[in-house]
A protein has these predicted regions:
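FIC/Doc superfamily catalytic core
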Residues: 1-290
Length: 290
């Protein structure tokens, strides 16, 4: 869509049936579902699981914020504000906001289904008192944004015009909960993540909210009892592949390669988390037997 000398990308809606011809997706989906189920099972039997989930959230906050350029260590994230050097407090606040936003959103899922209202509430908490707080926290954008480059003229990617954001986000919300389509949850989540990052509905914080949406979806739909799966570490370790895979959907309409990449990330990350929980149980058992 061309306006004012630039061309924004207008994604198609997603709330409909999806099928695929790529058999690799079936195998990857099976692997990812198995790993996710094992992760969930371990999270139900590990004693003091909430303490480990808390540390999981801190690590995710640090990694997800690091992708955006925030430099705070996990050790610093656990300190109180008055223990942080003044020049590092902005970065520290961004990470603490992320932790608060995850915890608030998960608690809200007990009362509300996953919704755009909850997404906006989470965004408002994420942006509270930090860089970007003047960029409409808690509200979908009312102006054009862009990704990469210093302006609209040299941007790598220009998300849809602001006038289309409410309808696109309403379509996304309907897709989260549409029980009349036979789309497996992890494939649905892959499509959701692509679509959210493509809409880029906020002026700031889209990457963090997009990554945070994943555990919310999994907990909200009963695939996880605890928010124990976070993909930021996988995305950061494969950063170039991550951005390339998203852009290939936009440029070549190749959604299958993105779904494959996403399912690999879920399988790897859930498998790592499962192994950590298994080690915790093993150590606990050895300790009790001594």
């Amino acid at each position: 869509q061309s306006r004012y000398q630039y061309k924004s990308f207008e994604p198609v809606t997603i709330n409909h049936e999806w099928t695929w011809k790529d058999p690799a997706i079936n195998i990857l989906l099976e692997d990812a579902n198995r790993a996710l189920g094992e992760l969930n099972a371990f999270s139900l039997i590990v004693p003091d699981i909430d303490l480990f989930i808390e540390m999981h959230v801190v690590k995710e906050a640090q990694t997800s914020s690091r992708i955006e350029g925030t430099q705070t260590s996990i050790a610093e994230a656990l300190l109180s504000e008055n223990q942080i050097q003044p020049e590092k407090r902005n970065d520290w606040r961004e990470i603490r906001n992320y932790i608060d936003a995850v915890n608030m959103a998960i608690a809200e899922l007990d009362k509300l289904p996953l919704s755009n209202r909850l997404v906006r509430m989470t965004h408002a908490m994420l942006m509270r008192g930090v860089r970007g707080e003047h960029k409409q926290p808690g509200a979908f954008r009312s102006s054009q944004n862009w990704i990469g480059g210093s302006s609209l003229l040299d941007a790598t990617f220009i998300p849809p015009h602001q006038d289309g954001v409410p309808d696109l986000m309403a379509d996304l919300e309907a897709f989260w909960h549409n029980q009349n389509i036979a789309v497996p949850h992890l494939v649905r989540l892959a499509i959701v993540h692509y679509q959210f990052e493509t809409i880029h509905p906020f002026l700031d914080g889209n990457g963090r909210i997009g990554r945070l949406l994943m555990p919310l979806y999994l907990v909200g739909h009963g695939l996880l009892a605890k928010p124990s799966l976070y993909l930021s570490d996988f995305f950061e370790r494969n950063r170039a592949s991550y951005y390339d895979a998203l852009m290939r959907v936009r440029l070549a309409n190749d959604l299958a390669q993105w779904v494959r990449f996403f399912l690999q990330g879920v399988a790897q990350t859930a498998g790592k988390g499962r192994d950590v929980f298994r080690q915790i149980l093993s150590v606990r058992t050895e300790t009790e037997q001594k």
